[in-house]
Amino acid sequence: MSQKTIRVGNIEIANDKPFVLFGGINVLESRDLAMQACEEYVRVTEKLGIPYVFKASFDKANRSSITSFRGPGLEEGMKIFEKVKKTFGVPVITDVHEPWQAQPVADVCDIIQLPAFLSRQTDLVVAMAKTGAVINIKKAQFLAPQEMKHILKKCEEAGNDQLILCERGSSFGYNNLVVDMLGFGIMKQFEYPVFFDVTHALQMPGGRADSAGGRRAQVTDLAKAGLSQGLAGLFLEAHPDPDNAKCDGPCALRLNKLEAFLTQLKQLDDLVKNFPPIETA
């Protein structure tokens, strides 16, 4: 099966190439935190030879509670991303929530992300596709992997084939998510790069009444399981103080564990990508 390669700057993204890391923090809590986190990600990924894209949200528009922290907003968020790009020379990715945001975000960010909860919103999908930017499409918790072909088709019909698919878990009853490992193979059949959002797959949505809980202790186990499928990349959030993070702290890796974590995953990815294919159909 041929696999499509997406290029972001000098980074090549494909299921049969070394994995790329979309890594950062959940939300732009502050400019200082974004710079601190990106500095550590850059240090570790350069040391290990992992292609890297910084990620964060300028607005968390789907928080459980009306009082939850959402972020700095579009204008300030884009200023922070510009500072990160200028300082560290890395591409950036962030999510878009409304059609009018698509072009202003694409003007600054190298990859724009379609949120899982909004992945069937045609007006948003088309607006994002028409920017011509690379799009990371999060698979909704309520969609089967084979249904992603319809979202891909919407983007393609709008003239954009610079697309990435991203698994982030499926609803399993109330307040729980599971990851169907067979789904990765199904999505890879579309030939676009497939990523695994291990952080949000660890969520327990609404598990803390007014916010999501999570299972940080299992991040290494789940990440290894995902990358063993031979994927284009990993989507990860890390925080210097997860217990006091303003969003999704229970799912975030401790930033001081990043090097040990990625060292093992790099070794696993190298091993898996060197296996010859076995035809079992």
Swiss-Prot record:
Q: So what family is this one in?
A: Belongs to the KdsA family.
Q: PANTHER family, per this entry?
A: PHOSPHO-2-DEHYDRO-3-DEOXYHEPTONATE ALDOLASE
Under the heading InterPro entries, the entry gives: Aldolase_TIM, DAHP1/KDSA, KDO8P_synthase
Q: Which GO terms describe its biological process?
A: keto-3-deoxy-D-manno-octulosonic acid biosynthetic process
* Cross-referenced Pfam families: DAHP_synth_1 (PF00793)
Q: What is this protein called?
A: 2-dehydro-3-deoxyphosphooctonate aldolase
* NCBIfam families linked: KDO8P_synth, PRK05198.1, PRK12457.1
One Gene Ontology MF term: 3-deoxy-8-phosphooctulonate synthase activity
All disulfide bonds of the chain are: none
Copy the pathway line from the protein's UniProt record: Carbohydrate biosynthesis; 3-deoxy-D-manno-octulosonate biosynthesis; 3-deoxy-D-manno-octulosonate from D-ribulose 5-phosphate: step 2/3; Bacterial outer membrane biogenesis; lipopolysaccharide biosynthesis
Organism equals: Stutzerimonas stutzeri (strain A1501)
Highest taxon in the source lineage: Bacteria
Q: Which GO terms describe its cellular component?
A: cytoplasm
Protein keywords: Cytoplasm, Lipopolysaccharide biosynthesis, Transferase
User: Catalyzes what?
Assistant: D-arabinose 5-phosphate + phosphoenolpyruvate + H2O = 3-deoxy-alpha-D-manno-2-octulosonate-8-phosphate + phosphate
Gene of this entry: kdsA
